[in-house]
UniProtKB/Swiss-Prot annotation:
<dbReference type="InterPro" id="IPR014719">
    <property type="entry name" value="Ribosomal_bL12_C/ClpS-like"/>
</dbReference>
<dbReference type="InterPro" id="IPR008932">
    <property type="entry name" value="Ribosomal_bL12_oligo"/>
</dbReference>
<dbReference type="GO" id="GO:0003735">
    <property type="term" value="F:structural constituent of ribosome"/>
</dbReference>
<comment type="subunit">
    <text>Homodimer. Part of the ribosomal stalk of the 50S ribosomal subunit. Forms a multimeric L10(L12)X complex, where L10 forms an elongated spine to which 2 to 4 L12 dimers bind in a sequential fashion. Binds GTP-bound translation factors.</text>
</comment>
<dbReference type="InterPro" id="IPR000206">
    <property type="entry name" value="Ribosomal_bL12"/>
</dbReference>
<protein>
    <recommendedName>
        <fullName>Large ribosomal subunit protein bL12</fullName>
    </recommendedName>
</protein>
<dbReference type="GO" id="GO:0006412">
    <property type="term" value="P:translation"/>
</dbReference>
<dbReference type="Pfam" id="PF16320">
    <property type="entry name" value="Ribosomal_L12_N"/>
</dbReference>
<dbReference type="GO" id="GO:0003729">
    <property type="term" value="F:mRNA binding"/>
</dbReference>
<keyword id="KW-0687">Ribonucleoprotein</keyword>
<dbReference type="GO" id="GO:0022625">
    <property type="term" value="C:cytosolic large ribosomal subunit"/>
</dbReference>
<comment type="function">
    <text>Forms part of the ribosomal stalk which helps the ribosome interact with GTP-bound translation factors. Is thus essential for accurate translation.</text>
</comment>
<dbReference type="Pfam" id="PF00542">
    <property type="entry name" value="Ribosomal_L12"/>
</dbReference>
<dbReference type="InterPro" id="IPR036235">
    <property type="entry name" value="Ribosomal_bL12_oligo_N_sf"/>
</dbReference>
<dbReference type="InterPro" id="IPR013823">
    <property type="entry name" value="Ribosomal_bL12_C"/>
</dbReference>
<keyword id="KW-0689">Ribosomal protein</keyword>
<comment type="similarity">
    <text>Belongs to the bacterial ribosomal protein bL12 family.</text>
</comment>
Length: 121
């Protein structure tokens, strides 16, 4: 059985975000690696934090209003009901990655208004 890159790419194109997230976790566990980008060695931690231009929105808890949070996650991510529910049920989990500060704060405000606990990273 030959490894066909085109077939793998085609399968990945059809996968949901939740399935891709599970794939990344499985690869990390199997090969004992992380998907995090390499960090520049001793470039000055204070400078790196001040120059941060990309933010990730992490759902830490759905809170008491889980249905409202699921609806908001669907609106933000474009996921279907089942995928959004699985994402919320799997908290803590990333909702959106690579956002600007203003976009991340906007998503955070929407989810917190729905009753969720959010962390920006």
């Amino acid at each position: 059985m030959a490894l066909n890159i085109e077939n793998i790419v085609a399968e990945l194109e059809n996968a949901t975000i939740l399935e891709l997230s599970e794939l990344v976790k499985a690869i990390e566990e199997k090969f004992d690696v992380t998907a995090a980008a390499p960090v520049a060695a001793a470039a000055g931690a204070g400078d790196a934090a001040a120059a941060k231009d990309s933010f990730d929105v992490e759902l830490t808890s759905a809170g008491d209003k889980k249905v409202a949070v699921i609806k908001e996650v669907r609106g933000i991510t474009g996921l279907g009901l089942k995928e959004a529910k699985e994402l919320v049920d799997g908290a803590p989990t990333m909702i959106k990655e690579g956002l600007s500060e203003s976009e991340a704060n906007e998503v955070k405000e929407k989810l917190e208004a729905a009753g969720a606990s959010i962390t920006l990273k």
